[in-house]
Regions:
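Extended surface/linker regions that mediate inter-domain or inter-protein docking
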Residues: 123-183, 262, 266
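Gly/Gly-Pro-rich "capping" loops immediately C-terminal to redox-active cysteine motifs
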Residues: 36-37, 43, 60-95, 107-120, ...
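Electrostatic cytochrome c docking/interface patches
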Residues: 27-51, 153-188, 275
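N-terminal export/targeting leaders of redox proteins
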Residues: 1-44, 133, 138, 272-275
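Periplasmic/extracellular electron-transfer cofactor-ligation site
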Residues: 47-74, 99-107, 134-139, 185, ...
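C-terminal capping alpha-helices of c-type cytochrome domains
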Residues: 91-98, 102, 115-141, 224-229, ...
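A short alpha-helix capping/helix-coil boundary motif
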Residues: 25-26, 32-34, 73, 107, ...
Length: 275
């Protein structure tokens, strides 16, 4: 199933690019880098961030959960957030989003918490406010059932739980290029790294998958071209670039123009040779 393959890209690229034993930054720190606040309403701010961060991409447009099962690998649903969220306290929700753990301490799987560890408290509060505003709908979703394929990859260390991925994050990736590029790095870490890996080098996430490009390719884009890519999904040469085009239209068009410019500036600087 295509959706399941997309989810596995992030987990596989983490395994391929991260060194083990690296301690993550403490979740919940009051980061100084934040997404733009274009509304004083926390629910509206959280709604925008939920789109940028991809909540509906995995949990569905109504956040009622989706079936990501793959025969022979796993039977797995994303949670129906409209049913799950009311039973969590705010700290428990933050721990689920940033740390990949349920309220009972058990691990989530394929929740990309490693992307969200650095999200500022004010932004996290807004996301939680938005999630709490959603009316209950649909049934609760079942816990995952791992079949032979998943069990083998778990045993081999190729498929990891969300908290295991959090524990392996190297906080220097994507590269820290200084305060001037901090916003771009912050956004890239929470979004682009999901498919292109924490070092943004791309690659083939698992056998048979389409290779993800090294994001230093963005050095070939000017501001107008990059705006078109991230808002309309049209790459240089009037091309539709598959998953990237879908993600741009579904997520990155909700970034502000200044946020998209910050991403481009960061990627341009990243592509420059180091002395």
């Amino acid at each position: 199933m295509v959706r399941w393959a997309v989810a596995r890209i992030a987990a596989s690229l983490i395994v391929a690019t991260m060194a083990s034993g690296l301690a993550p930054a403490p979740p919940g720190s009051d980061a100084t880098v934040r997404f733009a606040r274009i509304s004083n309403d926390p629910v509206a701010h959280g709604a925008r961030l939920s789109r940028v961060l991809g909540c509906s991409g995995c949990h569905g447009a109504l956040l009622t959960g989706q079936d990501w099962s793959e025969p022979g690998f796993a039977r797995i649903w994303t949670s129906n957030l409209t049913r799950a969220v009311p039973s969590y306290s705010d700290p428990q929700l933050a721990a689920a989003i940033r740390g990949g753990v349920r309220r009972d301490g058990s691990p989530l799987w394929d929740m990309p918490s490693h992307l969200f560890m650095q999200i500022a408290n004010s932004d996290m509060t807004a996301v939680i406010a938005y999630l709490r505003s959603r009316p209950p709908a649909g049934p609760a979703r079942p816990l995952p059932v791992f079949e032979a394929g998943a069990r083998k990859e778990i045993a081999d260390g190729r498929y990891r739980s969300s908290p295991a991925n959090v524990a392996r994050v190297d906080t220097a990736l994507p590269a820290d290029l200084g305060a001037e590029f901090a916003l771009g790095r912050h956004i890239v870490r929470a979004t682009c790294a999901e498919c292109h890996g924490p070092d943004l080098r791309g690659g083939v996430p698992y056998p048979g998958a389409i290779a993800r490009p090294d994001l230093r390719i963005a050095a070939g884009y000017d501001t107008e071209q990059f705006e078109r890519l991230l808002t309309n999904g049209i790459a240089i040469g009037d091309r539709d670039v598959g998953l990237m085009s879908q993600v741009a239209r579904g997520r990155y068009k909700y970034l502000t123009e200044d946020e998209r410019a910050a991403v481009l500036a960061y990627l341009h600087r990243l592509a420059q040779p180091t002395s």
